[in-house]
Amino acid sequence: MGRAVGIDLGTTNSVVSVLEGGEAKVIANSEGSRTTPSIVAFAKNGEVLVGQSAKNQAVANVDRTIRSVKRHMGTDWKVSIDDKEYTAPEISARTLQKLKRDAESYLGEDVTDAVITVPAYFNDAQRQATKDAGQIAGLNVLRIVNEPTAAALAYGLEKGDKEQTILVFDLGGGTFDVSLLEIGDGVVEVRATAGDNELGGDDWDQRIVDWLADKFKASHGVDLTKDKMALQRLREAAEKAKIELSSSQQASINLPYITVDEDRNPLFLDETLTRTEFQKITQDLLDRTKTPFQAVLKDAEISVDEIDHVVLVGGSTRMVAVSELVTELTNGKEPNKGVNPDEVVAVGAALQAGVLRGEVKDVLLLDVTPLSLGIETKGGVMTKLIERNTTIPTKRSETFTTAEDSQPSVQIQVFQGEREMAAHNKLLGSFELAGIAPAPRGVPQIEVTFDIDANGIVSVSAKDKATGKENTIKIQDGSGLSQEEIDRMVKDAETHAEEDKKRREEQEVRNSAESMAYQTRKFVEDNKDKVSEDTQNKVEEAAKAVDEALKGDDIEAIKDAVEKLNAESQEMGKAIYEAEAAAGAEGAGADAAGSAANDDPNVVDAEVVDEDTSAEDDKK
């Protein structure tokens, strides 16, 4: 059995963590960073880039670079690249594959299982899509866990057995959640959760982009939003400015050669955004976090004064205005500073993986369903069977009847949401229960059962009590993918993994060949006086053969050329060694001759006799 990891699959960045010796450790990726950008790019040579490498080339490859795909999970969104369509789970699977690969590289063994986190306010469709992404990436998804719950698990286990109430304020790149949890004696229980799946750091970035574009248009009369490459540069500059404003009062944004004017003269963007101006243009976004905050307190029936700790989660909570608002909403409570908002969710996910694998004992996680579940009844009414903030897993049944005489079947339409009319809520799926015995309306008894598992994924069944006929649906409209499609995507992902590995190996061969030719030529140049002209020509000929092979696509030809160059290099090295050895022998011979002369008994070393002095001595 392979290892299990915890994964925070984020809108902007993702993190993977593993349990080692009972402690959760965040794993650095192949680039050495503890966070991996959730960006996937399809290079024009067919290579699939994920993470920082995808982010680095985004400006030059805008149409083939995909970011913030998490916002499309649970929808029918697709992107077409090279006449092939990719769904949101497929793109997310690429990020998961990289995290899996980096974890395996660190651990030195296979990673087979994972706990993956999702925003607490994700509906069934989005949860199912996330689970599908894990499956496509070759992972057995042990559990889908709410991000605030994972954060509280990571934070709360260090706080001992004393029962405490924790507020988790989670503002990520694309989603917002706020949850109230009670932790004590190894039990983590979610009391209530609320949020907004369309609110996150991306929206703050977009406000800066709009501000910059408006400023530039006013100054130069050019709309940068119409230029894809310029727009991508604005997005990257906006993200950097937002981060800078978390620690500085102002941020300078300078983008040279952003575009050209009508006469093809280059134009430059140079603006300064102050923190005050930034907060002014994003105030309405900040205000949107207040409603879910108040809703959670109301649903949990808890006052602000009863909150013991406040935990900020998600990189977007580093914005000064966000932390100030949380302090204001909690009557002056300072958010906990000892938690890394980028990593705490992945750490909690790794702990939950440990719980599910039996590696962490005496911990019980009690999560809730974020939205009410029900069916459409006569008049389009939403009849709820499971209310929001119900602890999961759970199962509820209710008996319904027919609306017409001799009705042969009933259509069960499953919805998720809080609105009174079904049409205003999210349709999760529908199925038909046929074969109902003819009877006056109101007589047949049809039992509808909702079953939510620990992942928050819903199954619904309907049973005619008279005939015993039953029909069940596991809601899978979330990703719009059948099991056959998922299996195909798994194979496709495996194939691409092999292709990517092959491409990497081929590039390594090319890099090695190029380096070999360069180093060999440099060595010849540095040792010209020691190498015969004939040997130099042979080596240069072999190096040219490598150059020619590198122009083509035949990897075996490159390897053969390198092998021949290597052989010629060894011959050259041998010749140099022999020449130096011979030269050394000659020098040794000369030394030996001198030594023999010194052995003459009539010769005295270093004694000089002055003739005049000798004459004086003789006189004495």
Swiss-Prot record:
Residues 607-620 have a biased composition (Acidic residues). It comes from the Bacteria. Belongs to the heat shock protein 70 family. It comes from Corynebacterium jeikeium (strain K411). NCBIfam families: PRK00290.1, prok_dnaK. This is Chaperone protein DnaK. The keyword ATP-binding applies. CDD domains: ASKHA_NBD_HSP70_DnaK-like (cd10234). Signal peptide: none annotated. Residues 492-519, 583-620 are annotated as: Disordered. The lineage of its organism: Bacteria, Bacillati, Actinomycetota, Actinomycetes, Mycobacteriales. InterPro entries: ATPase_NBD, Chaperone_DnaK, Heat_shock_70_CS, HSP70_C_sf, HSP70_peptide-bd_sf, Hsp_70_fam. Induction: By stress conditions e.g. heat shock. The modification Phosphothreonine is found at T175. Residues 492-511 have a biased composition (Basic and acidic residues). Acts as a chaperone. Residues 583-597 have a biased composition (Low complexity). Keywords: ATP-binding, Chaperone, Nucleotide-binding, Phosphoprotein, Stress response. One of its GO terms (molecular function) is ATP binding. Gene3D superfamilies: 1.20.1270.10, 3.30.420.40, Actin, Chain A, domain 4 (3.90.640.10), Substrate Binding Domain Of DNAk, Chain A, domain 1 (2.60.34.10).
